[in-house]
């Protein structure tokens, strides 16, 4: 695992986007299609803005999947991850081959359909974040590290739901859905390359737990340390609690 610490979230977004753009160009040079998983949330704003402006990427040859979606949330809601990806990635790039998780449909049917498409070929690149509770996608602690299902329905813990309020997606905890469809941990780890974009001081405790603590279901994103080709981008604030030894050696 490679660790990059930049000055602020703007530098994180620019550096991670440059890395992602280079990876996509390399993939498209050797394959007809690049198969991509994208993350959502406030931590991805600067990254996706920079990436969608990067030159030399044939986005019409990119097949897109995403990590998670709330069960029962309409696409018109500001917090809908389908809405997020349509506005911040798909429409800006012209991606036409995308598989969005429809939280308004029967979850079992969505999981079968999108999971089947996801597993039909190798995923080349995955963009992820780390939650304030250490979650990876919506796999809150204690996460299921064993299931081989592509997606699963999960119960969202209170820390995760409060994060959504604090980021401004909802005005109260009562408004935040309690269940979501989430890509599984094992499915995320099947990606050939993972780029994690994790700025902000509010992520510092989770970053420390995931990078310095035991690899544990209680710190779900700690599992990224077992992936052979992962790069984590932090800013000074999200890296603030790391020991110097860790920040130098990872």
Regions from the PLM with identified roles:
Residues 1-36:
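N-terminal glycine-/serine-/threonine-rich phosphate-binding loop
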Residues 121-146:
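Glycine-rich phosphate-binding loop
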Residues 38-43, 128-132, 199:
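Glycine-rich beta-strand-to-loop/alpha-helix junction loops that act as flexible
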Residues 25-55:
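Glycine-rich N-terminal segment of FAD-binding domains in flavoprotein oxidoreductases
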Residues 183-186, 190-250:
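ATP/nucleoside-binding phosphotransfer catalytic cores, i.e., glycine-rich phosphate-binding loops
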Residues 58-127:
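Ligand-binding beta-strand-loop-alpha-helix segment within the catalytic cores
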Residues 49-59, 141-150:
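A glycine- and small-aliphatic-rich helix-loop capping segment at beta-alpha/alpha-beta transitions
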Residues 137-183:
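Class I SAM-dependent methyltransferase SAM-binding "motif I" and its flanking Rossmann-like core
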């Amino acid at each position: 695992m490679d660790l990059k610490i930049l000055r602020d979230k703007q530098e994180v977004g620019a550096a991670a986007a440059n890395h992602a753009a280079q990876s996509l160009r390399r993939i498209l040079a050797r394959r007809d299609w690049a198969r991509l998983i994208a993350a959502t949330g406030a931590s991805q704003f600067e990254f996706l803005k920079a990436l969608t402006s990067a030159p030399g990427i044939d986005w019409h040859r990119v097949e897109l999947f995403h990590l998670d979606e709330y069960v029962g949330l309409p696409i018109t809601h500001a917090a809908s991850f389908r809405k997020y990806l349509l506005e911040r990635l798909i429409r800006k790039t012209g991606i036409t081959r995308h598989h969005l998780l429809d939280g308004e449909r029967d979850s079992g049917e969505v999981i079968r359909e999108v999971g089947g498409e996801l597993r039909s070929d190798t995923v080349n690149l995955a963009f992820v974040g780390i939650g304030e509770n250490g979650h990876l996608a919506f796999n809150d602690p204690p996460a299921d590290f064993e299931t081989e299902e592509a997606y699963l329905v999960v119960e969202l813990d209170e820390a995760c739901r409060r994060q959504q309020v604090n980021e401004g997606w909802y005005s109260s905890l009562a408004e935040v859905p309690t269940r979501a469809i989430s890509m599984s941990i094992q499915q995320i780890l099947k990606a050939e390359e993972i780029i994690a974009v994790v700025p902000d001081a509010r992520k510092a405790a989770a970053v420390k737990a995931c990078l310095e603590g035991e690899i544990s279901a209680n710190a779900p994103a700690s599992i990224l340390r077992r992936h052979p080709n992962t790069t984590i981008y932090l800013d000074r604030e999200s890296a603030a609690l790391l020991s110097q030894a860790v920040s130098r050696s990872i």
